């Protein structure tokens, strides 16, 4: 089957960018896929992997992103401002690229821009806020669940780390509640994504993932 094609008018020549995935009326192009792989590798400090397996995994993640974007638009969810991720970007640069010239050199080596990095960090923050707003109100963590997690996970680890000391639930309660709430949110998110995929016409062009 022939792949759908898009002409990139911004290119100096007629460069053809193939559609890799269609999600409803949205598309993910091969250049979108390529850029996502590069930016993710840059943030993780590894070399980009353009194997079919990585392209497939990246495409699946980008499908989820499109589904969330559609839900946010339809539900009029708030989007965090770009300024909200600048502290995280600053921390990243200070940790890995304290020299501004080194940061720019690394961007060039990965074939990406500072804007690409900012967009990725903004999306990560947007996703976290979406999950929190969309699913946290329905999450309930019971006292028994907190006690069970403490007995099975926290107490053994704390005892091993501090022999001779008896860990107290009160010292870990808030942390345990946050952990369990986060797990419940993730579970609800996975369920929602499965339902959203069933409701949405998704077409993957396997040829573009080779």
Question: Language-model features: where?
Answer:
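Peptidyl-prolyl cis-trans isomerase
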Residues: 15-22, 52-210
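N-terminal targeting signals for Sec/Tat export/insertion, comprising classic cleavable signal peptides
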Residues: 17-48
């Amino acid at each position: 089957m022939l792949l759908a094609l898009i002409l990139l008018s911004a290119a100096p020549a007629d460069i053809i960018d193939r559609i890799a995935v269609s999600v409803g009326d949205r598309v993910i192009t091969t250049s979108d896929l390529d850029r996502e792989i590069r930016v993710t590798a840059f943030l993780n400090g590894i070399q980009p992997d353009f194997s079919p397996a990585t392209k497939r995994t990246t495409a699946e993640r980008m499908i989820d992103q499109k589904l969330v974007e559609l839900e946010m638009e339809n539900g009029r969810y708030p989007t965090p401002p770009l300024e909200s991720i600048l502290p995280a970007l600053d921390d990243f640069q200070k940790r890995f690229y304290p020299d501004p010239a080194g940061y720019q050199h690394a961007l060039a080596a990965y074939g990406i821009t500072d804007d690409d990095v900012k967009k990725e960090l903004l999306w990560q923050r947007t996703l976290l806020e979406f999950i929190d707003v969309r699913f946290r109100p329905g999450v309930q963590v019971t006292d028994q669940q907190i006690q069970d997690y403490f007995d099975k996970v926290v107490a053994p680890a704390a005892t091993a780390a501090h022999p001779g000391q008896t860990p107290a639930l009160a010292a870990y309660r808030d942390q345990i509640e946050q952990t369990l709430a986060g797990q419940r949110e993730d579970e609800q998110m996975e369920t929602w994504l499965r339902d959203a995929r069933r409701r949405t016409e998704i077409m993957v062009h396997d040829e573009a993932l080779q």
